[in-house]
A protein has these predicted regions:
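An acidic, Gly/Ser/Thr/Pro-rich helix-cap/linker signature
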Residues: 1-46, 174-181
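C-terminal amphipathic alpha-helical segment
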Residues: 160-189
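Short, solvent-exposed loop/turn and secondary-structure capping segments
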Residues: 64-69, 136-139
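Short, functionally critical alpha-helical segments immediately adjacent to catalytic or ligand/cofactor-binding
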Residues: 47-62, 123-128
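Solvent-exposed, acidic/flexible segments
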Residues: 24-35, 44-47, 66-74, 94-102, ...
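Solvent-exposed loop/turn segments at secondary-structure junctions
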Residues: 59-62, 80-81, 130-133, 169
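Substrate-binding/active-site groove segments that recognize
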Residues: 69-90, 102-109
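Catalytic and binding regions of secreted/periplasmic enzymes and modules that target cell-wall glycans
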Residues: 109-139
Length: 189
């Protein structure tokens, strides 16, 4: 289901292997037991368990992360948050409630998976760049192969970064990587 290796992924495997970013994010997730909860929610929505690690890339599991246009562990923009049931107002912002936001992330990822025919590379690119952007690019370039699409830099690098991060986390920190994962998944990897 997931591409395991290519030059774009390997480039980021080198980056993530030579710094402590993945370890620090997994430590934060482990100490707060975020992954246990996220895995349960994603299992309920029948999502690939690897997607539970998306917050490493989005926010390093920082529930208060703020990039200026997106907030929370899942880095939702205001419009996406509201589309998926989160309240965003002056006095309260559900994007910062990681439990509520996790359910919204699961619904959004499920919808992206359906929209892109369970091609999770395209779905992840849609999570980053927006599903309409991805559909325009696929139509104009005549391909549904993520690896052949020419995309803006952030989206072009998003999926290889995610897959590299998964590889480093699984191989270097398995005890944290598999925390809360379904047994069938942990035993088959």
């Amino acid at each position: 289901m997931w591409k395991q290796s290519n030059p774009r992924i390997n480039k980021f495997v080198q980056v993530y292997s030579n710094n402590n970013h993945v370890k620090n994010c997994l430590n934060r997730a482990s100490s707060k037991r975020y992954l246990n909860y996220i895995h349960r929610v994603f299992y309920k929505y029948k999502l690939p368990p690897e997607l539970a690690h998306l917050p490493i890339l989005e926010s390093c599991f920082d529930t208060k992360a703020d990039s200026g246009h997106a907030r929370g562990m899942w880095q939702f923009t205001r419009s996406t948050a509201e589309d998926y049931g989160l309240s965003v107002g002056f006095f309260s912002d559900d994007r910062l409630n990681w439990r509520k936001a996790t359910h919204s992330a699961a619904r959004y990822l499920k919808k992206l998976g359906e929209r892109f025919n369970r091609n999770w590379e395209l779905a992840l690119a849609g999570y980053n760049g927006g599903p309409s952007y991805m559909e325009r690019q696929m139509k104009s370039q005549g391909t549904r192969n993520f690896w052949k699409l020419k995309l803006r830099k952030e989206t072009h690098e998003y999926v290889p970064k995610f897959l590299a991060m998964l590889k480093v986390a699984r191989n270097k920190f398995p005890e944290m990587y598999f925390q809360g994962a379904p047994r069938s998944w942990a035993s088959s990897s």
